[in-house]
Amino acid sequence: LNNEQLDYSSAAAVEVHDRGLALFRGKAGCISCHGETALGDGNVSNYDKWTEQLVDAKGRTEEDRLEPYRTSFQKYGALLPRPIRPRNLRQGVYRGGRRPIDLYHRISQGINGTPMPNQEQTLTAEEIWSLVFYVRSLPFEHASRPAGVRNLDRERPN
């Protein structure tokens, strides 16, 4: 399966899209960072891999973990570490390019130094292409409320 050879209006495209959605929410584990609706609102407390090793391993509060930076590095002008925000996939802007092959490489190889894992050992090539197809469809879909989420919007009085 090559994403560029697929007729987007065909029944096969619907099947590939649905397979990609199932992988996104399941086996690939994308929702843990990118969120249920791929808005980048999943886990937002990850740091880059280098900082994560320095500040995250001992179960301390974030305030405690950042104390060494405040007391030693900051006086020399170093900035405090900041969490890496997962990409909002609905915007259609991706690190490393938006061509199908670019997304395939991002998913299969991951992004070095970030929490974005490689999926090469987890997913087959066909599964990665299904995921690419699904991710490329996201900017054109309405971001809907995930199933099971309560509607907390209140009606306004007239």
PLM regions with names:
Residues 16-19, 88, 115-118:
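Conserved beta-strand positions that form and line the central face of beta-propeller blades
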Residues 37-100:
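Gly/Gly-Pro-rich "capping" loops immediately C-terminal to redox-active cysteine motifs
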Residues 35-37, 41-48, 117-119, 143-148:
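Short, solvent-exposed loop/turn and secondary-structure capping segments
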Residues 10, 14, 27, 97, ...:
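Short, solvent-exposed loop/helix junctions and linker helices
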Residues 1-14, 83-92, 110-112:
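Short glycine/proline-rich turn/loop motifs
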Residues 12-36, 43-61, 131:
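Sequence/structural segment immediately N-terminal to covalent heme-attachment motifs in c-type
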Residues 1-2, 100-158:
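C-terminal capping alpha-helices of c-type cytochrome domains
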Residues 1-26, 39, 145-151:
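Electrostatic cytochrome c docking/interface patches
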